[in-house]
Amino acid sequence: MSLYVDLSIHKIEVVKPKIDLKPVLKLQEKVDKTLPKDEYYCPTEFDEMMEDMEGDYILLGVYDRDKLIAASFATQYGSLPDFKPVTDYVDIPVEKSMNHEFVIVDMDYRGNGLQKRFMDATMREARKLGYEYMWCCAHPDNTPSVCSIEGSGYKLATTVQINDWTRNIYYRSITL
């Protein structure tokens, strides 16, 4: 076994959703089980991803050989757990904003800077699609996510409590 693993980011083509999204959903489930608190992450369900993919979206992955070890999903849609648009909390134009829905990294591959690289790659792709802003959420106590988000230039807009979910809402301009 080689000690070197190619951690290049690749676009995930979704031609047959039930097959192509299965590794992403499986990875979400695996990652969710490794987190210290349930409220740190709420996996995106298949139906929700399909709905979000009706508009612009960016789905990226990193593979170790043929195994998906990290994934990132951003969509022109997306809402908070209360189903309100982010513009209820942040003063950005919704039609020029893309939601970075999730970044998930297999526990065995954490510490390689994948989350930050995904965030940077997603911003570049969103810019190519004509978007000017990105927004995302994280639990305030999920330190690795908060550090990656803030390290990628996102600014904290507000912290909200929605039912049992506490979320920091972040946003940033992605224009050059």
Describe the predicted segments one by one.
Residues 110, 136-146, 162:
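Conserved beta-strand-loop-alpha-helix junction that forms the acyl-donor binding cleft
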Residues 126-138:
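Conserved GNAT acetyl-CoA-binding A-motif
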Residues 70-102, 110:
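Conserved acyl-donor/pantetheine-binding loop and adjacent beta-alpha core of acyl/acetyltransferases
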